[in-house]
């Protein structure tokens, strides 16, 4: 799970910081930087893959130079920094089945990507700083804040075990010497050294595959588990073919939905009933989800039975129903762990049923007060006041965080010049408070009450609609 992030130098982020909960809701109008945060999380996840930086950056929206914070038409940041704090599982295994119990489950990973030009003017990206360090148990209050004091001492020990001795670094950088060091787990472990002077074109973390570097491997696996759902109706509707086998894990576009459901049914027959019940609550008219092993056509197929006992193939279900079905299946999939990012989950949903899909997303998150709860996390972004209004149902639940994204003016000093930048800020919503709230530590960051947040979103929504109407009139 990601518990906090710091970003500097990426797109609209300058000295940006925010915290995450098991369920995090980010609301804001278009252009406020909501999608940029998802882009940052996606980039971090891809940086853990064993690929060169230029390939990873080329997958982002915009050119490589546009990904660095722009100061003016001709000036931009020369580096970008990401720092994430994580909660990882206590036990991990590598690709060869070797297992290890971690000393630390709370870890902080920092990566700095810098740019320079080669002799013919091409942009070169390289890793200029990388580190992985434990977060000390003393003073780490994230678990307590996310469980509102409901955590027993034994449960706290499960999530954040006591460790005797001085914390060690698992990846470290000495900038003056230009050396990144990867430290093997264990006392007096061997060291592998990589030299930044040779312009490392991929992260050290991406090359970790062995349990010998267990804490680094745990962070790599955590980043690789982050999924950004962009469910495609075409992929959701397709049966899973034996002959063109692509696995039984649901992809970000919804492929393998049928094979995943069949696997779940085979391991737990009750799960299919739970999925049917969830879907019937969300979509009126359906009462049962069926998955079949079609041996004649060598494929797994999903059907849905209506309340009048008519069987419908997944090929004829609406896009909205298919998206909801995919989430229902994920809820009952014990192989689903990690971060799930979802943009505008309210799309295609009857406004009167938004509370049901929010309940569904909440069920997709970890309950840290329950022993052995899988580390599941959901981050959504939305511009819907209805989604934010639904948060009142969880006003006393500290496992949920709500933020309002907006753009703020920042004066930045660089090379004896002052630049006026529009940067993304996240303003926390206090679900239990009344009136206006302001963060005393940062004068330019505002904390909202729920009513403030709703008024802000509704006002901006109206302003956007009026601007659209005026533009339409101007084109006549």
Q: Could you say what each language-model-derived stretch is?
A:
Residues 95-273:
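Electropositive, glycine-dotted interaction segments
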Residues 438-476:
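C-terminal alpha-helical "lid" subdomain
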Residues 1-50, 271-274, 278, 285-453:
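Switch/communication elements of ASCE P-loop NTPase nucleotide-binding domains
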Residues 39-108, 112-121:
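Conserved P-loop NTP-binding catalytic core
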Residues 80-82, 227, 298-300:
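Short beta-strand micro-motifs in enzyme catalytic cores
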Residues 9, 84-92, 134-136, 304-308:
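Short acidic, glycine-rich loop/turn motifs
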Residues 89-91, 233-238, 410-412:
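Short, acidic Gly/Pro/Ser/Thr-rich loop/turn segments
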Residues 80, 107, 224-225, 397-400:
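Short glycine-/polar-rich loops that comprise or flank the Walker A/P-loop
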